[in-house]
Amino acid sequence: MLKAAITTLSFLASASMASAGSLNYFVTNLVSDQPGVAQITDPSLVNAWGISASSTSPFWVSDNGTGVSTLYRVVGGVVSKVGLTVSIPGDGSVTGQLFNPGAAGGAFNGDNFLFSSEDGTISGWRGSLGTTAETLVAGSSANVYKGVTYGATGGFSYGYAANFRAGTIDVLKGSAGAPTLAGSFVDPTLPAGYAPFNVENINGTLYVTYALQDSTKHDEIDGPGDGFVSTFDLNGNFLGRLASNGPLDAPWGLALAPSTWGTFAGDLLVGNFGDGSIDVFNPANGMFLGSLTDSSGAPLSIDGLWGLDFGNGKNGDVNTLYFSAGPDGESHGLFGVIAPVPEPGAWLLLTGGIGMLWLVRRRAV
């Protein structure tokens, strides 16, 4: 009964806040490697980077600092850790990850999830592998993969990896018979010194973020205005520049807000690793619409912000934005949620709901 009450309250509050169209948001930490910082503590969650999920699975999170991927369920605003922890091969410097819808057809050895790493390794996991992912592409000093996404075109599965060192989008074939894609994934107007930092397939369009390379072409250089976002089709043909400089600061996280997400419904959210802000753009014409702000109206900032993802409805609310981060210079980790600040009516709902939960708890004693 108590669990049902919590779930009902969370759903009603979420629905009320999503429809309110609020411009202000607040952050709730769900998981941290540091005790007392979030709902639960998980020492494996260090420099939490990429996030992925199937339509029904828990959240899979890349833990760059510990070389594993950890799994979390979020139901009714309450998070729990799944028993499975997957070790990533190579040096374990895992960054982005993807869910592979083509696994049932044998794409990528039937691996359900794929992972990119900074040592150039691409790895994959399926249930029969147990707690260790397999190597699909061996590591190489020529490659520094910061992100990866999935796409299907011409009846074949492909992976698209952001190679920060080489300055390319590297295409991974899901099967040996897949044809080579015709496009080059080149933005012809991109300034020298910038390289693909992340890539995300959103409704069949590939969005590529670019950050400024350091002298070793391994890490990004943060700074106001240092970033670009361009779009390509699944064959690698350049579609156009979506965003340039302005509020961008080493952009990495990408997510499309659902149609029910208030003022920014249907807009592209771009998370900046550099300053931790989240910018909003019209996904069709690139118009800058503003940035998420906190309860005081100041720009919302999450230290070491990496991934952005909405829930799938089975795990995590579809109207709720989840994030991963590597705060304190990537030495710690966070997995959390960003939600609209409730309007007065929603606060009354929450207050009444808290009273209901208190009554339920008393009756349960």
Language-model segments: which ranges?
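Bacterial N-terminal signal peptides that target proteins for export
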Residues: M1-I6
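Bacterial N-terminal signal peptides
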Residues: T7-A15, G355
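Charged, amphipathic alpha-helical interaction segments
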Residues: S10, A53, L349-G352
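An N-terminal RHG(E/S)-centered segment typical of histidine phosphatases
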Residues: A18
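Sequence/structural signature of beta-propeller domains
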Residues: G21-P340
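A short, hydrophobic C-terminal helix/tail in secreted or cell-surface proteins
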Residues: E343-V360
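Short, charged juxtamembrane terminal tails flanking transmembrane helices
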Residues: R362-V365
